[in-house]
Amino acid sequence: LNTGVANKRMVFSISASLMNEIGAAELELGIKTHRVQQVTKKSNLMVSNTVFHRFQNLKLSQARPVIKLRQLAACTIVLSLAACASAENDEDKGKIGFVQGFIGGVVADEPNAALIGRDVLSAGGTAADAVTAMYFASSVTMPASASLGGGGVCVIFDNGAKKVEALDFLALSPKNIPAGIERPTAIPMNARGFFMLQSRYGDLRWAQLIAPAENLARFGTQVSRALAAELKPIGSALVQDEEAARVFSNSKGLPVREGDFIKQFDLAATLTEIRTKGPGALYVGPFANRFVNAVNAAGGYLTKEGLRSALPVWRETVQSLPYNHKIAHFAPPAAAGGVVGAQMWSMLAEYDDFDDADETLKSHMLAEVAMRSFGDRSQWAMPTGHSRIDPKQLVSEGHIKSLMNGMSESRHQSAQTLSSVPQATPETPSALSLVAVDRFGSAVSCNVTMNNAFGTGRIAPGTGVILSALPGLNGRGPMSLGPMIVMNPNSNEFYFAGAASRGVTAPTALVNVAARIVMGGQAPIDAIRQARTHHGGAPDQLYFEPNVSSSVLTGLKSKGHQVAPVQGLGLVNAIACPDGLPVRPDTCKAMNDPRSYGLAVGAE
């Protein structure tokens, strides 16, 4: 990787004295704790060859390097993974380079996190391991959306178990919030959520996945372009908080900028607790008690019982109608973008001519199905993103066909004439996307959010944890979230995993990219670079990016669309394997949106 920036390699060991046994804290989760208990199995755990890349003046075009992986020329494509696996030495598992050949791929909104995820896959980790490590790294490098104070949702495909499911760990509202609380806060869920994910689907030691994030916080990291972009509009307000100013202001008291060096000692100490004692330390026991007091001191509201009892939930995914034997799985409400995406996908599957459509017709059909989905959302979605109606009913064949009434290839239907008229609602653009695929053909796609950029704008004193805003107030919440995975249940093959952010445009951008690849046969890189359009129905206007061609715009206008330009429509992170994984790993591409400052690594 040659980006013209300094790279620093840190090797460190974790003292046996820190390897405390896991107590009752994890038992409060009611789930298996063997992944955390593995921390105690070695008296001296060496986490080696972890690379921390310092990004200085990282150009957009430089944030998408292709990592060349060694190929096994003597193996056929079908047998290569099995042959490689037989050559792996379990004694080296956990060390970078353990996996020879195809390792999978990762995508993250912040480059340091993606590089750590890549190292995890190289060390023999699963997609769940990689996403877990990327999340905790992001809690240090992208706290605007990924602080330990927030929550999220993931969709998981396990190739071995032939199973797809969703994990809901969205940040919850405390019960009975007293009047007069200055800045009400949601209950933190990320630590428990990713522990539950890794407990079920991970393979590496818990401590090994947390240690890179802990080091980033303790030894410091440079502000990436991704974080600088999040800080720019609200940095001045953020540093009014004394605790936040200690981290995010420079020697002159001004917000830090790209390239500035920051250390987060309090957050490092919190991550040490999570690494050595498991995530339960944040929810039960002495540290949890201090955390509750710190949240309340920061103007929030949290109780010991509320913190202890907040648990992630495994849920069924929202499944689309089939297209060419493939099913698209989306996160369920309260990640309401999942139903919006599943309905859009299902209407395109019923339409069944997306692959033969020209660019004008593709943009038109994407707009028509989107505004119908948003119109339907106005009927079923609560302000928190939860559904008044069973999600299965919302994606049933009968309901999808009813949504398609009046839809035409040749003419735009006025949003006001739909059976469910779309309603304009505010939605926070603040969220973060993480995607990983491993060498076994398993995949994980996740969104995490603080329900507002930097949550409440307060840090719980002494913990380094930025606190999440309450969901459901003034558009703050998971309404636009909806990570997805496309797979074939008959052949048990993986084809696409993705997650998106940037508010109301997130589900339309994600389906746009996925449909172009899976239904339209477009090359993955071309699909994510393709100029986008968006139609939310309120107002009845089709928005387009500046690089949409004049011929397409002319065609859309001729179909009755009112069009308006915007600078960018959604940010998508995705991994696509057009010919299926694990059979054809050579077709896989990891893709970071060129509209963002993240990084895609591997999957080549």
Regions found by a protein language model. Give the residues of each.
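Short, small/polar residue-rich loop motifs at catalytic or cofactor-binding pockets
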Residues: R315, T428-A431, A453, M479-L481
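Bacterial N-terminal signal peptides that target proteins for export
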Residues: T50-A73
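Extended C-terminal subregions enriched in glycine
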Residues: L510, M519-Q567
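C-terminal motif of bacterial Sec signal peptides marking the signal peptidase cleavage site
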Residues: A82-A83
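Noncatalytic scaffold domains of N-terminal-nucleophile
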Residues: S86-L115, D119, G125-V284, N289-K326, ...
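Internal maturation/activation junctions in enzymes
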Residues: E350-T449
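Residue-level detector of structural "landmarks"
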Residues: L1, A25-G30, H34
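Active-site rim segments in enzyme catalytic domains, especially the processed small/beta chain
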Residues: A128, V140-A146, V153-F157, E165, ...
